[in-house]
Regions:
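A structural boundary/capping signal
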Residues: 1-150
Length: 150
């Protein structure tokens, strides 16, 4: 429903701008980077009681379903396509990254939010908005200090 009927999809043309990361703007435009689309999906799915977890792959954020013998991954940036563990490992290898098992595990809420903020730091820096960049960097530091896994 989110990707089909509602039309949410990856923001390929505006990947490096804050509007593809800020959830209010992603909801309005229905375009976002992987982590933003995953956050919207996670919020809706959890509200419905679905057992989904954030998965912080390097270069591509996904949603994981860790029920049963093998996890299943949802690639929100690719229209909600389901991926197997092997497919996700291949995606990592195709991007010159190690297929490390740790990459395939859920991440904490703090880690997810810190990653969102790091993206915004980079995006605001690229636009020359040092004030906003510094603001989101303070959020990163606060989140990293209080991560429940730290």
């Amino acid at each position: 429903v989110i990707f089909g009927e509602e039309g949410y999809r990856g923001a390929q043309e505006s990947f490096a701008v804050p509007s593809s990361s800020l959830l209010s703007q992603v909801i309005h435009s229905r375009r976002g980077i992987p982590i933003s689309l995953c956050l919207i999906f996670l919020l809706v799915a959890r509200r419905l009681g679905l057992p989904v977890e954030p998965v912080g792959l390097p270069g591509r954020f996904m949603v994981g379903i860790f029920r049963g013998r093998e996890p299943l991954y949802l690639d929100c940036y690719e229209g909600g396509a389901f991926r197997t563990r092997a497919e996700v490992q291949l995606l990592l290898l195709d991007n010159q990254l190690p297929a490390d098992e740790a990459f395939l595990l859920p991440v904490t809420t703090h880690q997810t939010l810190a990653r969102c903020c790091r993206n915004l730091v980079s995006q605001f820096e690229a636009q020359g908005d040092d004030r906003s960049s510094r603001l989101f960097l303070t959020f990163v530091h606060a989140l990293e200090k209080t991560d429940e896994r730290a």
